[in-house]
Amino acid sequence: MSAEIICVGTELLLGDILNGNAQFLAQQLAQLGIPHYYQTVVGDNPERLKQVIEIAISRAQILIFTGGLGPTPDDLTCETIADFFKTPLVENPEIIEDITQKFAQRGRVMSPSNRKQALIPQGAEILPNPTGTAPGIIWQPRPKITIFTFPGVPSEMHPMWEETAVPFLKSQGWGKEIIYSRSLKFWGIGESALAEKVSSYLKLPNPTVAPYAGKGEVRLRVSAKATSEAAAEDLIAPIEKQLKEIAGLDFYGVNNDTLASVVGELLRASKETLSVAESCTGGGLGQMLTEISGSSDYFWGGVISYDNSVKIKLLGVNQEDLDKFGAVSATVAEQMAIGVKTRLATTWGLSITGIAGPTGGTDTKPVGLVYVGLAGPKDEVTSFEYQFGTVRGRALIRHVSANAALDNLRRKLLTR
């Protein structure tokens, strides 16, 4: 038995809003141990929705709909489902009373159009909506087919799922096994290269291992099916250990870890401090660091030296080197790192200078060229060159540049 998630709404198809409901439901199904292999987004069109239902019932036994339960003419989910299964709609007086009271609490009178929300397929059970006017339903129109409908508003749908659908599914025997996953994170290695290194692990049945790409990083999702989270972790732990050993320094964290949080813990453990000097990232590196609660323990501040005059006045970058090598160069990156470390009196100084685009590139210095400078104890200084030209978009180049800088510091802290 498996489930299928069907999200209804033209606004989803047009990309006007993100489909957070599908993500939420996928995570919830995993926690209940219910497999699901398909997610569908369909616009507010009854004929296309019927086609989706026809396909869904051929491959899944639990159909979960979100959206299309409002009072407007394009909210057609319930009536389309009823029409597909050739079942009449009936007006439910409990829903009418609930909607009437909610309007009264706001000092308003229920609109006639809201009566539409009280029409549900004959034989369906109401799923109350504590906050909104659109109730859901649970309905078994055929043997071995169970349908849930929920409003598309996440703040309404999430509690309705947890308070009504989860208890029902558990009463049907689900939840005795769960699917639990851990996400291993890697920086400095491509998806194909990592997949090749761990290829034998990609064939495991339980836990399973699957690679996928993030924003400049690669992840391995390790998922286990077991009777409890603790039992799943016991299955995952030895595989996780082996994967970390294979990846070496390319592995940096799990689940919600970020390069900024990992670097922060390393600095805190060694009682060292960090300052940053940024050009093309415009404060993005400092923002990543200060998103971590308690980062003032090790992060002392930074300089956004976007203009060359700031590089000279605040960081002590040499004018002659700027003229000779340009602002985007290893020499200037190193001087920026030394300058911020010296002026803020920190253990480490980290700098970034580059061309984020889309303009500003040349034949010799194309868009995506980035230099990272790292100054540390005992006057040691080094620089790293990156070519992020294949990375699309200014924002993403800035993001991967900041993380690349953090990764260099992480590797230095781990290997000195």
From Swiss-Prot:
Top-rank taxon: Bacteria
SMART domains: MoCF_biosynth (SM00852)
Pfam families registered for this protein in UniProt: CinA, CinA_KH, MoCF_biosynth
InterPro entries noted in UniProt: CinA (IPR050101), CinA-like_C (IPR036653), CinA_C (IPR008136), CinA_KH (IPR041424), Competence-induced_CinA (IPR008135), MoaB/Mog-like_dom_sf (IPR036425), MoaB/Mog_dom (IPR001453)
Family named by the database record: Belongs to the CinA family.
UniProt cross-references to NCBIfam families, sorted A to Z: cinA_nterm, molyb_syn, PncC_domain, PRK00549.1
HAMAP family listed in its UniProt record: CinA_B (MF_00226_B)
Protein name: CinA-like protein
Species of the source: Nostoc punctiforme (strain ATCC 29133 / PCC 73102)
